[in-house]
Swiss-Prot record:
Organism: Rhizobium meliloti (strain 1021)
Protein's UniProt keywords contain Membrane: yes
Record membrane topology: Single-pass membrane protein
Family: Belongs to the ATPase B chain family.
Protein purpose: F(1)F(0) ATP synthase produces ATP from ADP in the presence of a proton or sodium gradient. F-type ATPases consist of two structural domains, F(1) containing the extramembraneous catalytic core and F(0) containing the membrane proton channel, linked together by a central stalk and a peripheral stalk. During catalysis, ATP synthesis in the catalytic domain of F(1) is coupled via a rotary mechanism of the central stalk subunits to proton translocation.
Coarse class of the protein's main subcellular location: membrane
A GO molecular function held by the record: proton-transporting ATP synthase activity, rotational mechanism
Keyword terms of this UniProt record: ATP synthesis, Cell inner membrane, Cell membrane, CF(0), Hydrogen ion transport, Ion transport, Membrane, Transmembrane, Transmembrane helix, Transport
Record's protein name: ATP synthase subunit b 1
Spans traversing the lipid bilayer: 3-23
Length: 161
C-alpha cells in the first residue's frame, strides 16, 4: 500500500467526518433545519390566520356597505315621498289661494258693478227729480209744488231703501 496523496486525502476525509460526528454537527444542522421549519410553519400559520381575519373583515365591510346602501336607498325613498307630499301640499295651497283670490276679485267686481248701478240710479233719480222740479215749477203753484215734491222724495226714498 502506498502512502500517496490519495491515501492522505482519504485519511483527511475520514478525520473530517469523525470530527464532524464528534462535534455533533449533524444534530446542530438538524436542529437548525427543524428550527427553520418551525419558523416557516409558524409564519404559514400566522399568514393563514391573517388571511382568515382579512376575509372576515372583507365580509364585514361588504355587509356594512350593503347595509349603508340599503339605508341610503331608504333615505332617498323617504326624501322622495316627502318631496312629493310637499309638492302636493304646495299645489293644493296654491290652488286654494288662487280660488280665494278669484272669489275675492269676483266679489269686488260684483260690488263695483253694484256701486256703479247704484250711482247710475242715483244720478238718474237726481236728474228725474231735477227735471220734475223744473216741469212742476213751470206748471204748478208754490203749495202744489211743495206737496208734489215731498211726495216724490218719499217715493224715491222708499224705492231706494
Amino acid at each position: 500500500m502506498a502512502l500517496d496523496a490519495t491515501f492522505y486525502a482519504l485519511v483527511g476525509l475520514i478525520l473530517f467526518f469523525v470530527l464532524i460526528a464528534y462535534l455533533k454537527v449533524p444534530g446542530m444542522v438538524g436542529k437548525a433545519l427543524d428550527a427553520r421549519a418551525d419558523k416557516i410553519s409558524n409564519e404559514l400559520a400566522e399568514a393563514k390566520r391573517l388571511r382568515e381575519e382579512a376575509q372576515s373583515l372583507v365580509a364585514e365591510y361588504q355587509r356594512k356597505r350593503k347595509d349603508a346602501e340599503a339605508e341610503a336607498a331608504s333615505i332617498v325613498a323617504a326624501a322622495q315621498r316627502e318631496a312629493e307630499m310637499l309638492t302636493a301640499e304646495a299645489k293644493q295651497k296654491t290652488e286654494e289661494y288662487v280660488a280665494r283670490r278669484t272669489a275675492l276679485s269676483e266679489q269686488k267686481i260684483k260690488q263695483a258693478e253694484s256701486d256703479a248701478i247704484n250711482a247710475v240710479r242715483a244720478a238718474a233719480v237726481d236728474l228725474a227729480i231735477s227735471a220734475a222740479e223744473k216741469v212742476l215749477a213751470s206748471k204748478a203753484d208754490a203749495g202744489a209744488q211743495e206737496t208734489l215734491f215731498k211726495k216724490a222724495i218719499g217715493e224715491v226714498k222708499a224705492r231706494l231703501n
